[in-house]
Amino acid sequence: DLIIKLANKLQRQLLAKQNRSWEFDLEEGLLDSSKLPRVIIDPYNSLSFKKEKDLEFKDTVVTLLIDNSGSMRGRPITIAAICADILSRTLERCSVKVEILGFTTKNWKGGKSREKWNLENKPINPGRLNDLRHIIYKSADKPWRQSKKNLGLMLKEGLLKENIDGEALLWAFKRISIRKEERKILMIISDGAPVDDSTLSVNSGDYLEKHLKQTVNWIEENSKIEIL
């Protein structure tokens, strides 16, 4: 029920937020209160009515970016996969294209990034020290029917590791930016702050969280993409 409500809520949000347009000076419809003073001044003036125009639904694409970290193991990742499945089906019915992406790391303890840092005599402030894993479960142009089996891969044992959200968001942003749709929405499904022990052990404790906030702010200030 919760997932269906979420799908319906997103669907309503997509249909809302569109600029409303009205036809005025009609003989029937909603009473146009802005024209009442002229009727009061001269009772021979007829009442004026207005009607909302039917707007064509904006060409829209939605990206779902799903946290595939270890903290999502069990019920959370199952719910996320079901949620992505239902949203994809629901929005496809509204002619909205949906891309489903996932993000995690290849390793628990840094992998090749950490090995390289060790070989270079551990320079200070090294930045990210883990290898990223970005997954395309469903591209925007692929129908849900052809991609639905891919969502089960989220439940694969051993996939869920660390979460480096800022770079994942940038990756998703770059993918949606090149789309031709008029309206672009990026929805992040995550259970908390970014965490990667290998990176945070040699950088400031808020290093990844700060980068995520900077990324969100940059996207909001420099693009028309809506982040949910």
PLM region descriptions:
Residues 1-228:
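Acidic, glycine-rich A-domain
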